[in-house]
């Protein structure tokens, strides 16, 4: 964020699978936090002006050649520093301590025994469960440090040098398995770093509106509106900031959920007054996809065609200088650090032609998904948009296995509407992370009205998750599943069988394609 007066704690990224959680937990306390590359220098940190620094965990060994390092001048800034797991080992190693391979690795929940008073552990019990996940351990601490906590396999599980405001813990306070981890992070942020804890979504809105107005001035902004949560929130935020200087292009490719296109136009165009150019490109997309079965081919064609349609419409407009996107903080982290690995491609408007000379505006690029929903609520947006299900860019087209036909597409659109209606009626729409139907491209024999049928089998996929990285299948009530199945078979043509996907992630992904 550009505002250097904002209280913030930065997290240096050393590759831990939990590093995003650290920033999230600090934000939940009411202090803004963001991840930064471990390559950041002390000089750059001075310019950022944080009130504290956290060193994340990571998979490396600090004593190996080429392991992720730190500018040693960072320890001389006079800022509170908290090292977590690898971060603790790095802090100890760089300041003269010793780190070696543990004789016995420590993975899972372990009891932490506090051995002395510490501001970091204020208000937490003397013995508490914490999550350990390390193959190395500190075997000698630097001069000026003393031990405040031990575990069965880590004699230096928590250490500190209060004179220099340096703290190290071998475990992960950011995960829920560390029962009092949030209290430790709160102690670090509020008591040790001296944060006021007053960062809120309301403050974020005021700051972003100010930033947008300063950046845009009297120029025009173009937004690719998908109807999803992210682009919708961007649209409403920009509308509040710059009003009629914003033009949104909404491409209806024909693979949206039932009633979605109309809802976007009525809510965002009507209630919130966005200037929306709706492009009906359903035939254009379908003509390109009819008969195709390979999911990657479908994705590429839809992505490319979207770019062409968007480009055609953008070229009709004059005097547009800025392009707005709904990029989230998770996208920035995945693409912007040297510790991240790409698992699958995104479907955002990221592949726009290079000759479209726009400056980017990404007002959500410091927010996580749950924070975007909170922002939408703060902006007065209705729940049906704010809590809309995550939806892939290619839409329902990748929820049809095998060759894509209008008939199969309609089975998914209608059955999905029934599923969403019944989940909402049961009051479970916020308990289930994501839910949808899939046309499996499998036909089976059935009997309906005393006649033999040979129709499609649809699958219901419903999952529970915290962050979407891992997921369990949702254990929906049997009577609810029975009701959904009965409605789909009776109300949706060409369907005679429903199955329920009971696979977790991993090994499966959320989507079938």
From Swiss-Prot:
Entry keyword set: ATP-binding, Glutamine amidotransferase, GMP biosynthesis, Ligase, Nucleotide-binding, Purine biosynthesis
GO molecular function annotations of the record: ATP binding; GMP synthase activity
Entry-linked InterPro entries: Class_I_gatase-like, GATASE, GMP_synth_C, GMP_synth_GATase, GMP_synthase, GMPS_ATP_PPase_dom, NAD/GMP_synthase, Rossmann-like_a/b/a_fold
Reaction catalysis annotation: XMP + L-glutamine + ATP + H2O = GMP + L-glutamate + AMP + diphosphate + 2 H(+)
Domain (Glutamine amidotransferase type-1): residue spans on this chain: 8-198
Enzyme Commission (EC) number: 6.3.5.2
Pathway membership: Purine metabolism; GMP biosynthesis; GMP from XMP (L-Gln route): step 1/1
Function summary: Catalyzes the synthesis of GMP from XMP.
Assembly and oligomerization: Homodimer.
UniProt-recorded name of the protein: GMP synthase [glutamine-hydrolyzing]
Gene that this sequence comes from: guaA
